[in-house]
Design a protein with these regions (language model features):
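N-terminal organellar transit peptides
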Residues: 1-133, 144-300
């Protein structure tokens, strides 16, 4: 009669079985390799549409949760390619990355591709280390807003503007009304507040790394990655693959974790939900032009 199995026998059998199973897994998927998941933060920051790929807190939150929830991750890499966009959305994404990094005790490394400008640079500041290509566009730490004035045009062609509003400033900066200097001053005050918050964030994250006068660093100017290194806006010149292989070894596994578009973002019969909405396509075309203009500001 066979002797009953002991706890040591069971543990030994499990170890051998586990080893055999691991041998069947391709090398690139084994957990014994260092793992650094990569999150792409690409496009104009704000609400996304079918023709305007962009970034928003709603669109990236679940992806960030998944990445920082990977127990075997040695670090988290952010691949950033953004000319900026909404200050609020930029800050929301920044805060979520910092909160998750602290909760999960994860080091975050940002890799700048074409650009990390304005809100895109705010995202980069969520990292513990920023690496840029020598030709990346970096900086543009400022706030910008713009509009058009159509009041003279509609008067010339005989169109009368009729606007009904409750609240003294509800129609502030209406493009079909003559520009009011007091409205412009209110807008500039709002922009100064947002700019001050942006400056405080950069100073808090970069601390003693910054190497330049405030008048230079926070003027809204942007620089190449190489020049940004001298100003202390980035920590190193390099690229994602080479840097991670140097830090974590040639066998480092860098899975790209894509954002989940969700049910409402999926396409039905080749058409997305947004495109089915009245005026959706026209709005997307305008958004696409605005996106193109924002990239063009940096020569991209």
């Amino acid at each position: 009669m066979a002797e009953p199995l002991t706890g040591d026998d069971l543990r030994g059998g499990w170890t051998r079985a586990r080893t055999m199973l691991l041998d069947l897994i391709p090398q690139r998927f084994r957990r014994d390799r260092p793992v650094v998941p990569v999150v792409r933060l690409t496009g104009v920051i704000g609400l996304s549409t079918p023709l305007r790929g962009g970034l928003s807190m709603a669109g990236i939150a679940r992806t960030l949760d998944r990445v920082f929830g990977m127990r075997n991750a040695a670090a988290v890499a952010l691949a950033i390619n953004s000319p900026g966009g909404s200050p609020a959305q930029s800050h929301l994404i920044f805060r979520r990355i910092r909160e998750l990094a602290q909760e999960k005790n994860r080091r975050v490394i940002a890799f700048i591709e074409d650009a990390a400008a304005s809100g895109g640079y705010m995202l980069a500041c969520a990292a513990d280390e920023i690496v840029a290509d020598p030709n990346s566009v970096v900086g543009s730490i400022g706030v910008v807003g713009g509009s058009f004035g159509f009041d003279k045009l509609i008067a010339k062609i005989g169109i009368e503007r009729r606007l009904y509003a409750s609240g003294e400033h509800k129609a502030m900066l209406d493009p079909f009304l003559p520009e009011d200097p007091s409205d412009v001053e209110r807008l500039k005050k709002l922009q100064r507040e947002i700019h001050d918050d942006f400056i405080a964030l950069v100073k808090a994250r970069r601390a003693d790394k910054l190497n330049g006068a405030d008048e230079t660093l926070f003027s809204g100017e942007y620089w190449t990655g190489r020049r940004a290194l001298g100003l202390g806006l980035v920590d190193a010149i390099g690229d994602l693959r080479s840097t991670l292989r140097e830090r974590y070894g040639d066998k480092v596994f860098t899975p790209l974790v894509s954002a989940d578009r969700g049910l409402l973002g999926r396409r039905v019969f080749g058409v997305s939900r947004d495109e089915l909405m009245p005026g959706g396509l026209a709005g997307d075309m305008i958004s696409a032009l605005e996106t193109r203009a924002l990239w063009a500001r940096y020569g991209l």
